[in-house]
Amino acid sequence: MNLKQIAKDTAKTLQSYLTYQALRTVLAQLGETNPPLALWLHNFSAGKVQDGEKYIEELFLEKPDLALRIMTVREHIAEEIAEFLPEMVVTGIQQANMEKRRQHLERMTQVSLSHPSPESEQQQFSDPDWDNLAS
């Protein structure tokens, strides 16, 4: 397991996601102040935001002012969440893992209760009074 590579890949994915969030913010702002430009940006962005850096590069070629605006918003979002994001991620993963384990254990327990083993069935129906009558 290459932790440095995992960290790099995670950072790149997070950058792209923050680019997407910045785009949503700018689209909302433009929707109120310049609807035609918001429509243009929406159409331009369709299917292109998966790689945030490539998206910004392509937007620079078309409308540098919008690229700069999205970059500024993205940076602001990153600065605002950087302080508490690592703890939130770790806590979120721990809680999700615990919940999934609990659900799995419940399913396993329900399956074993609904399909008792032959030994447990025999013990269930074993009554000393009935056993004595059989002898």
UniProtKB/Swiss-Prot annotation:
Main function: An RbcL-specific chaperone. The central cleft of the RbcX homodimer (RbcX2) binds the C-terminus of an RbcL monomer, stabilizing the C-terminus and probably preventing its reassociation with chaperonin GroEL-ES. At the same time the peripheral region of RbcX2 binds a second RbcL monomer, bridging the RbcL homodimers in the correct orientation. The RbcX2(2)-bound RbcL dimers then assemble into the RbcL8 core (RbcL8-(RbcX2)8). RbcS binding triggers the release of RbcX2.
Q: Name one GO biological process term.
A: photosynthesis
Q: Which InterPro entries match?
A: Chaperonin_RbcX_sf, Chaperonin_RcbX, RbcX
Family annotation (PANTHER family)? CHAPERONIN-LIKE RBCX PROTEIN 1, CHLOROPLASTIC, RUBISCO CHAPERONE RBCX
What are the coiled-coil residue ranges? none
GO MF assignments: protein folding chaperone; protein homodimerization activity
Recorded GO CC terms: carboxysome; cytoplasm
- The biased composition feature labelled Polar residues covers 109-126
The entry describes its oligomerization and partners as: Homodimer. Interacts with the exposed C-terminal peptide of RbcL ('Glu-459-Asp-468'); binds 1 RbcL peptide per homodimer. Contacts a second RbcL monomer via its peripheral polar surface. A slightly longer RbcL peptide binds to RbcX2 with a higher affinity.
Domain of life where this protein originates: Bacteria
Task: Supply the name of the protein.
Answer: RuBisCO chaperone RbcX
**Keywords carried by this UniProt record:** Bacterial microcompartment, Carbon dioxide fixation, Carboxysome, Chaperone, Cytoplasm, Photosynthesis
* Pfam families xref list: RbcX
> Which taxonomic lineage does the organism of this UniProt entry have?
Bacteria, Bacillati, Cyanobacteriota, Cyanophyceae, Nostocales
Identify the stretch(es) annotated as Disordered: 103-135
Domain remark in the UniProt entry: The homodimer has 2 functional domains, a central cleft essential for production of soluble RbcL in which the RbcL peptide binds, and a polar surface which plays a role in correct RbcL subunit arrangement.
